[in-house]
């Protein structure tokens, strides 16, 4: 569980709720029956209870692009959402957000509970258009396409790259954009940013670019990748 303080820069409403999100997650992680020190159980649990640092990178990066943008009624998808912090950012921008996670229990006990508490505490009655989808990415289905797709710390398994590509290919609007926040390497798991970039480029459908790098000289280098359809 990350102890990092969440900072939604340039959005006053988001600054009000950041501590609530952290405090709630700290309580919840103690109450749910997940083995200690377990990040992943392949095919059963994909880390949705933990707040991953790449999700924190996303929610500090997104306001730099969208703080002054009108995103009302934009369709946004967060893949592998867990706590859903990037998706919540877009909810507060009045977008229609679909939260996707492998585990239904994560969506019910964590993501949806956040949204309910935020709506009640801050009278955010405008938050209405929320969808939840659980399950493996190979079974992902939606009745809409998305203007924006975001995902944090989901590129750790090379076996998932084809599934991710298929979602982008089938559900990203032609003028849409996807942001994947990722570690440069996932030690002991197999995935890496370079492997994913090579995979996406090999499909010859999308442009993929590194648009942000976090390198503190101590921890794993982290990147934000931007994906758009080729012109």
PLM regions and their residue ranges:
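S-adenosylmethionine-dependent methyltransferases
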Residues: 1-231
């Amino acid at each position: 569980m990350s102890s990092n303080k969440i900072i939604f820069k340039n959005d006053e409403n988001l600054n009000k709720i950041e501590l609530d999100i952290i405090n709630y997650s700290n309580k919840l992680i103690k109450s749910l029956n997940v083995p200690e020190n377990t990040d992943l159980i392949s095919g059963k649990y994909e880390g949705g209870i933990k707040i991953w640092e790449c999700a924190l990178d996303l929610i500090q990066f997104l306001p730099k692009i969208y703080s002054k943008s009108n995103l009302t009624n934009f369709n946004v998808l967060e893949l592998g959402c867990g706590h859903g912090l990037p998706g919540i950012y877009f909810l507060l921008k009045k977008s229609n957000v679909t939260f996707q996670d492998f585990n239904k229990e994560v969506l019910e006990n964590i993501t949806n509970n956040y949204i309910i508490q935020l709506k009640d505490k801050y009278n955010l009655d405008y938050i209405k258009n929320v969808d939840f989808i659980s399950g493996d990415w190979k079974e992902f289905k939606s009745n809409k396409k998305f203007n924006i797709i975001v995902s944090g710390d989901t590129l750790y398994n090379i076996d998932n790259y084809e599934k991710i590509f298929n979602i982008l290919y089938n559900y990203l609007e032609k003028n849409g954009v996807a942001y994947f926040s990722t570690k440069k390497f996932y030690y002991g798991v197999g995935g890496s940013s370079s492997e994913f970039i090579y995979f996406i480029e090999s499909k010859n459908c999308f442009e993929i670019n590194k648009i942000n790098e976090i390198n503190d000289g101590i921890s794993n280098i982290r990147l934000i990748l931007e994906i758009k359809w080729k012109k």
